[in-house]
Amino acid sequence: MYTLHYICLVLSCVIYFVWTLSCPTRNQYVSVKYVNLTNYSGPYPNGTTLHVTCREGYAKRPVQTVTCVNGNWTVPKKCQKKKCSTPQDLLNGRYTVTGNLYYGSVITYTCNSGYSLIGSTTSACLLKRGGRVDWTPRPPICDIKKCKPPPQIANGTHTNVKDFYTYLDTVTYSCNDETKLTLTGPSSKLCSETGSWVPNGETKCEFIFCKLPQVANAYVEVRKSATSMQYLHINVKCYKGFMLYGETPNTCNHGVWSPAIPECMKISSPKGDMPGINSNEDNSTPSGRICNGNCTTSMPTQTYTIITARYTSHIYFPTGKTYKLPRGVLVIILTTSFIIIGIILTGVCLHRCRVCMSGQ
């Protein structure tokens, strides 16, 4: 057999002594991407058929062949990239894909706030054993953030006691004896997304003391607890000629006096009746009787604010009716409709009605 080389074509003399065109060797076959020819070294006379295989990561369905026809190979279809399966949802996280899931694509994983990523942050669609493709490495896990046990406090405790704490767990602090101790600092703490307790700041149970008040025109009796100044009690005693305005005894409650410290106001009985009200008093009336406030017919019907040593209330005075005032009670009538002789505080005129006290 003889071979004739002419330009780029190869002629072969076959058994019938006829010159025919041959196809290029497979290493010259580069017109189709990602294609490998079967291991056949040639020559490739007219009619030769070779199986076509795709490179790694590419596939062709069905399996195809190429044939030498008049010096040219038939053109196969292109090999397509293999495709990985759609990733499963990442519990407590999310992912993004570049490459549309095909061979060579990459997934990037991130976890939601309050969760830690355990594993690789990325996976790639790579070739596996047997020619298949799959995501490598396996997807990570998003594990909830954990906090160390919350700080303990002296003379106090917290709620939600358990072996371990996770993101969004909350504890609330309280003092063992809330009548003596005051909670300072954050009363509640939260296990945050960083695995630390917030807000910052130390929580304590402390004894908070009250300052001994200075009351004008009075002296203060002190009764101190044997265990703590937190249980400090006082009684305010007005000097002669002054009357208590407010309430006593008073207790130091978490640094605040309760009820509020009273005042001692000078006793005065202005002569004459209050406009619209007749103050009827009989100085010879024995102690224990009552004073009558008698509303005259000339006074328009209206409501006054009555403040006594023990309460504050609104009293309605209907025309022609009598309002009886308990003995021993200082009554202050506030009004802005007319001026009354008395004490002016913050623009409000105060008038003390005369009171039956020990016949005086």
UniProtKB/Swiss-Prot annotation:
> Which residues are the signal sequence here?
1-20
Q: Where are the transmembrane segments?
A: 328-350
The residues that the database entry marks as glycosylated are 36, 39, 46, 72, 155, 294
Gene Ontology MF: a single term? complement binding
CDD domains recorded? CCP
Alphabetical GO CC annotations of the entry are:
extracellular region; membrane
Q: Which UniProt keywords apply?
A: Disulfide bond, Glycoprotein, Membrane, Repeat, Secreted, Signal, Sushi, Transmembrane, Transmembrane helix
Highest taxon listed in the record's lineage: Viruses
User: Domain Sushi: where?
Assistant: 21-81, 82-144, 145-207, 208-266
Which BP terms from GO are recorded?
negative regulation of complement activation
Q: Which cysteines are joined by disulfide bonds?
A: 23-68, 54-79, 84-125, 111-142, 147-191, 175-205, 210-252, 238-264
Pfam families for the chain: Sushi (PF00084)
What does the sequence similarity comment in the record state about its family?
A: Belongs to the receptors of complement activation (RCA) family.
Name listed for the protein in its UniProt record? Complement control protein homolog
